[in-house]
Amino acid sequence: MQFMMLMIPAVYQGGKKVDPGFVPDPKKVEEMGRFNDEMAKSLKLLSLNGLHPATMGARVSFGKGKPTVTDGPFIETKEVLGGYWLVEAKSKEEVLTWAQRCPAAEGDVIEIRQVFDKEDFAIKK
């Protein structure tokens, strides 16, 4: 089964305007790198990346008529994604165990979501 581990860092939350030039503390990056290496020995790590702050992003909203483009930051947004891991594991519990070991900062959140398999969309006759 594949799972997304979605990092919701405290530094991006609460409508905080994070400087477009923001980069995480090098010591935290190194610590996270060690965590990623260790996790990759246990789970199949398919992809991972950190995301620039929402101040550097844009959002496309679909409603009636033409889509609307809004440049970041998105003050009305409750939680802002800061990075992700895409892993393959035997169970959600296995992923939760690794998420709990993450060297996250106080106030950070990791959300675990299972990825749909193509079999999940198979039409049943």
Residue ranges of model-derived segments:
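Conserved, structured core segments of small domains
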Residues: 1-125
